[in-house]
Amino acid sequence: MLKTHSCALTQENIGTEVTLAGWVHRRRDHGGVIFIDLRDREGIVQVVFNPEQSAACLDIGKELRSEYVLQVKGTVSHRPAGTENSRMLSGLVEVVAEGAKILNTAKTPPFYINEEVEVDESLRLKYRYLDIRRQGMKNNLIIRHKTVSFMRQFLNDRGFIEIETPILIKSTPEGARDYLVPSRLFPGQFFALPQSPQQLKQLLMVAGMEKYYQVARCFRDEDLRADRQPEFTQLDMEMSFVDENDMMQLMEDLFTGLVASVRPDMKYNKKFPRISFADAMEKYGCDKPDLRFGMELADITDIGASSAFGVFKNVAAQGGAIKAISAPGCGGYNKSQQEELINLAKKYGAAGLVPISLGAESGELKDLTMEMVKSVSAKYLTLEEIKTIAERSGAKPGGLILIVAGARKMVNSVLGEMRNHLAAKLDLCDKNELSFAFVVDFPLFQWDEEGKRWDSVHHPFTAPLESDLPLMDTDPARVGSRAYDVVCNGYEIAGGSIRIHQADLQRKVFHLLGYNNEQIDERFGHLLEAFEFGAPPHGGVAPGIDRFVMLLAGETSIREVIPFPKNQAAQDLLFGAPSVVDDKQIRDLHIRIQTEKE
């Protein structure tokens, strides 16, 4: 080994002869004595090149520059009094160099590695191997390692078996577009990269494996967001002979144990509340609510219907909804600031937004007067109506009430977006807190207005509630599902369900989704046939590793916790992928590139 110790040296190492190897983090020349900070994965330690100790070492020290790769031999000693550095783990010790060797030189990096300064992301992705040397990225990848290690051990301890499933599979689109791989041996035919191992893990339950998991790579050719990548990693799990409560208890134990192990400094709830899908939409405007703050949506349709405000009366008369949220401390917003919120609501899909300011000064609701109220709608509402709206939305003097009226689905969606926007703007969320919950009682189907057909809310393998089976023929919209999501801080971090395990029921669901028998047999015949050989009741779940590590690391993009991610245009800037390939490779695959003109 070229090193005997890491650079994370402490007082316990004083007097020890060590051989270190790492990168020059900083270099300082103090009039004949050279100091460097030597960095490796574990830490940073000060190394002293003193001519009284070794003139040859000093000559090497003079050659050093940032990011040179260096081996040093020396003895760990106390730093002289007054030179200690409390900001470093090794700040009480130093190594006086007795021997040194430059293992490699380095060009000047395109950005500072020894400073946590903001760097253009494109540059970071192009030089990702340098970016990972920086403290933030290094720590994120260590958190990722600890997370995956805990997950594996947790499931191993509970009798799960890790089984790898194929990456080259049949294309059976599950919502997003597949990544296709042309077959050289079978011209005109294609493999697909898996969007998830969904059918494979269900087949493993038919095979009698009972408890399966894998750290699975998944691929989806979809539009990207901060928490999306074309390839991502999930902890894929499936169990036989379980119900929803069994799976949710497993998830609660997994996530609470994981946080306690990997980030014990973070606050988190050990018991996860269960919120119905309907309640989540009505109270928070989305099915993955951030519960670190309140600002729940308040239904004021009845107040609007009986008020003198024509806009509200018309919406209520047409069966629409009128809802409000309260922005604390925003009562002093001027016209320009309120206009900004109105435009934001329109961007999210509302026809407009009605702000009601309760004055700039804080106080109690009982002391509110009409003189304190500032709103274009104030002349249409009585003081009692405004107080009731304020009471329902949790507003007090000094706050700002925001009201949206229209179709219920739109109202919920717009105010849900406004709620999250205001929470970020007003800094209402504790960044060191993880607020978990289960969202349950999802519908099985949703109507696609554009396609004029039913879609699965989750996926077509989710089991319906047994009590709702008669509704499949008469009212699919009312059929409930046996699905459960784990949400945290406004993100879905795991989605799961009890699965269909009867061939006839699975075929019926496919029919409702618009497949005919020929399409069903061609795409899913292997699964339906397997169900005829004694498929056990089973269920599963798949926590997204990238997304949860993002939350553990306190980041806002999964690109910050993936070693070599694609950018937001799905490009790999380091390797230059996707790229043009050799004509012979194209010909060997029996495919032709069609130009735009064609």
Curated annotation (Swiss-Prot):
Which positions bind L-aspartate? Answer: E174, R220, H458, R499
What is the organism of origin for this protein?
Dehalococcoides mccartyi (strain ATCC BAA-2266 / KCTC 15142 / 195) (Dehalococcoides ethenogenes (strain 195))
SUPFAM superfamilies xrefs: Class II aaRS and biotin synthetases, GAD domain-like, Nucleic acid-binding proteins
Which proteins does it associate with, and in what oligomeric form? Homodimer.
Reactions catalysed, as given in the entry: tRNA(Asx) + L-aspartate + ATP = L-aspartyl-tRNA(Asx) + AMP + diphosphate
Of the GO CC terms on this record, one is: cytoplasm
Q: What does this protein do?
A: Aspartyl-tRNA synthetase with relaxed tRNA specificity since it is able to aspartylate not only its cognate tRNA(Asp) but also tRNA(Asn). Reaction proceeds in two steps: L-aspartate is first activated by ATP to form Asp-AMP and then transferred to the acceptor end of tRNA(Asp/Asn).
Q: What is this protein called?
A: Aspartate--tRNA(Asp/Asn) ligase
- Its family? Belongs to the class-II aminoacyl-tRNA synthetase family. Type 1 subfamily.
Q: Which gene is the coding source of this polypeptide chain?
A: aspS
PANTHER family associated with the record: ASPARTATE--TRNA LIGASE, MITOCHONDRIAL, ASPARTYL/LYSYL-TRNA SYNTHETASE
Question: Source taxonomy lineage?
Answer: Bacteria, Bacillati, Chloroflexota, Dehalococcoidia, Dehalococcoidales
